[in-house]
Design a protein with these regions (language model features):
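Conserved phosphate-donor/acceptor-positioning beta-strand/loop module used by diverse small-molecule
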Residues: 219, 230-255
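Post-Walker A helix-loop "phosphate-sensing" segment adjacent to the P-loop in P-loop NTPases
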Residues: 101-111
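Flexible loop/turn segments at secondary-structure boundaries
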Residues: 115, 223-229, 247-250, 310-313
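Glycine-rich phosphate-binding P-loop
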Residues: 84-101
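PAPS-dependent sulfotransferases, especially Golgi type II membrane carbohydrate sulfotransferases
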Residues: 1-65, 72, 181-197, 204-211, ...
Length: 410
């Protein structure tokens, strides 16, 4: 059985300071309770989960220690950050990799997300060591079969914000890694996301300290659940949101979730249970998107059509840049074009899945998300791919076997 108290205590001993983030212990207790009751872990799986949760607290406390020793870090400005988001599997990672071609922005690197200390600006020589250590760690861990087709990832590429949000145990994506439905609903309804994003900001300040200041581009699909909280922490935040057929999103996130949970679960993962969990998961994300859109700050979101993005990435980047009030230099457009040419669709394998595999009915799913699709002019997958000129030869509806993602990994 996992125990929140022992995890925090071990992290405190490892770093040598007391945990002063008052909100975090309660978040971890809720998560651990849900894990112990709702997610039967194999012995190896439980070790993996505990190791990850411990690393989260160690990384957070190391950041706190740096702040204690160098209080000027708290004054480090995080100016005009761009938050990249959208429903999970709606092209956010693809868009992040395009964004990474623009050197005017700072993105989190893969090794930084899991090994953020010491701050790179304070110990530049450690960067090379940590990069190499991260690559070796990934080789040792391995990925599930088909991972590269399902998720775009490079060992030395840009990374999302999950690890920084997980430092406070406030990351919605934990429900994809582990089955924790009670924790997920508590996160959505009660967890203090303002504190979660303050800890997230603190980590950005640490990475930026004594380094060149650039606007941050911060990708995490699940940022959509905390837009108001992000604005409380970052009043000058800018938002970019991708949109894709929710039926396709749902089938794809179900496959990803099934594979991730299977690595830690004691027995076979019930695919229909995954489908039910993810239907609720996506519904709650859509509800947050729609609620924010109707609110006073809905106009601050730049909306990106997934199908337009894969049809003409440079055009969509130019449109997005106009929304941000900046130009698109020729070298950025050329870099985006070159990256797309080097990473053609299905280059890392096909990604096959269907709603039916997860016990979901395509017609009822489509009906459930009609209002969202109408509001953001999101076409059904087949229509969108046809419009983009990327329609494969086989069936391409999430309700039928043989569906695939037209880019390597959204």
């Amino acid at each position: 059985m996992l125990a929140a108290t022992s995890i925090i205590a071990e992290a405190e001993r490892t770093v040598g300071i007391a945990d002063s983030d008052a909100c975090v212990r309660g978040n971890l207790e809720r998560l651990v309770d849900s894990l112990n009751r709702e997610f039967p872990m194999s012995p190896k799986g439980e070790m993996m989960v505990r190791s990850t949760l411990l690393m989260d607290s160690v990384n957070r406390l190391q950041g706190l220690k740096w702040l204690q020793d160098h209080p000027e870090i708290a004054a480090e400005p995080i100016e005009d950050p761009v938050f990249l988001m959208g429903l999970p599997r709606s092209g956010t990672t693809y868009f992040q990799y395009l964004f990474d071609r623009d050197r005017r922005f700072r993105l989190i690197r893969t090794w930084e997300s899991s090994m953020p200390s010491p701050p790179p600006g304070s110990d530049p020589e450690s960067v090379t060591r940590r990069r190499a250590a991260w690559i070796e760690l990934q080789k040792a861990r391995g990925h599930f079969e088909g991972f590269e087709a399902l998720h775009l990832y490079d060992d030395d590429g840009s990374d999302e914000c999950h690890a920084f949000l997980e430092q406070s145990y406030g990351a919605a994506g934990l429900h994809n890694l582990y089955r924790v439905p009670t924790y997920f609903d508590w996160l959505m309804d009660e967890l203090d996301l303002v504190q979660t994003y303050r800890i997230h900001k603190r980590q950005l300040q640490l990475l930026q300290w004594r380094s060149e200041r650039k606007p941050w581009a911060l990708k995490y699909p699940n940022h959509v659940i905390g837009l108001n909280e992000i604005l409380e922490v970052h009043p000058d935040a800018r938002f970019v949101m991708t949109h894709r057929d929710p039926a396709q999103v749902l089938a794809s996130i179900s496959k990803m979730t099934h594979n991730l949970r299977s690595r830690r679960c004691a027995g076979p993962v019930d695919m229909h249970e995954v489908g039910r969990d993810m239907l609720h998961f996506i519904q709650r994300h859509v509800d947050r998107i729609m609620t924010f859109d109707r609110g006073p700050f809905g106009h601050r979101v730049i909306h990106i059509d997934y199908y337009a993005l894969i049809a003409d990435p440079v055009r969509e980047m130019r449109m997005m840049h106009r929304g941000l009030g900046i130009d698109t230099p020729d070298d950025v457009g050329e870099a985006v074009s070159a990256w797309c040419a080097a990473n053609p669709k299905n280059a890392r394998g096909r990604n096959d899945y269907s709603l039916a595999q997860y016990g979901l009915d395509a017609a009822s799913v489509a009906e459930r998300f009609t209002a969202y699709m109408r509001r953001f002019d999101v076409p059904p997958e087949r229509e969108g791919l046809a419009r983009a000129g990327t329609l494969p030869s086989g069936p391409v509806h999430a309700g039928n076997p043989g569906s695939n993602d037209p880019v390597s990994a959204p």
